[in-house]
Each structure stands twice: as structure tokens, then as C-alpha cells.
Amino acid sequence: MDRKSISIAGSGKVEGGVYDRVKISGSGKVTGDVEAEEFKGAGAVTVEGSLKAGKFEVSGAFKAEGALEVEEGEVSGSFKVEGPVSAQELRISGAAKCGPIQGGYIRVSGALKAKGDIEADTVRLSGAFKVEGLISADRVEIHLEDRSKARELGGETIQVRRGTAFGGLLSTLGRLLGTHGRGILEVEAVEGDELDLEWVVAEVVRGRVVRIGPGCRVGRVEYHESLEVSPEAEVGEEVKG
């Protein structure tokens, strides 16, 4: 049975269901859960339920009152999902607020607030974030523009730096707001294989090869192979195991 497509231009409302393509331009609302091969929105888009899509692309203001499950997602603007987010590949540029995130490749450039863990193969965060759980991935890359917080960081390779990795907009905005260059990450623990950290405040850091760079304040470092500590960092205790 062929799936039909729906389109809203201007202001409108459609019922949830299973579709081929959903396209909303303007102010649109979907009442109930929706599943589509392709979901595109530009403007103010609200889903009163959960959304499952193959390709997901929105710009403007998007809100889902349930969960979000996509294969490939691109978001620009305001992004709010009440439930969990699952994606093979997800790129967000703007302000995002959601439940736990799980996926393959996750990139957020802007401001992120996640109620739960972020678990993926690769996580790249640029800007400022607050993650109530842990950030866990094979590769974690963080570029801090402002004060950020997570419970724990875990991964094979973890790198934390100040500054913007994915363009100059956040850097320009940070300078205008007076927060540029003040990025710092607060966590309880960092654990991985190769760790390269700057401007991290942590109770404990555990790794095989560890670099504690400028701006770090760490209570205890446990390392297996090598440890490098910057003179501009503070470490309470160093333990080789």
C-alpha cells in the first residue's frame, strides 16, 4: 500500500499517521504520532506526539511532545523534544532541549540541555551544554564557548578545548555577550583511553595516556602509561597504576 504525502503552507493542522513525505512551511501542527520517510519543516512546527522519520530536516522552531527517532537529521534553530532522541546521524545548530540522546554520529553546535545520557559512536559538542547524565562515545570532541556541565565523560578518545570548532558564529556571539573564551567544563569524572583535556574541572580523571592542559583543576589523576600536566593546571594527586 502506497503511503500518501502531506503538505502545509502557511498555517494548518494535520492528523498523525504513516506518510511518505511530510512538508510544513509556516506554522504547522501534527496531532498525534507520525511516521514518515521524509519530514521537512520550516517555520514553527509542533508534533503532538512522537516522530519517526528516515530523513528529518527542520529550520526555525521545532517541538515534539514525545520521542524522536530518525536515521538522518539536520536541525537549524530551536529544537525541543520532550522524550528521548535516537538518530544514526544528527546535526543540530542552535538551541536544543531534549531527553536522553542515543545514536551513531551526534553533533551539536550552540546550546544544549539534555535530560539524561548521551550515548553514541561519535559526539561533537561546540558551545555550551548541560547534560544531566553521562556523555559516552568512542570519540568525544568538545569545544567550549561558555560554562558547561555533565555528570561524567567516557570514551576511547576524549578531547576538550576552548573555542569553536564548527564556524565563527558562536565565537562572534560569545564576544558580543562577553562570554567568549570563558568556557569551562565541570564533571565528576572523566574516564577513557586517550585523554586530552583543557579547562576541565573534575574530581577524578582515569586513562591510559593522559594530558591535563591549561585551566584544568583535577582532584586525582589515575593513569596507566603516561601523564602530562601543564604548569597552568592544578592536580591534587597523581597515581600510576
Model-identified regions with their sequence ranges:
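Extended beta-solenoid/beta-helix repeat architectures
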Residues: 1-241
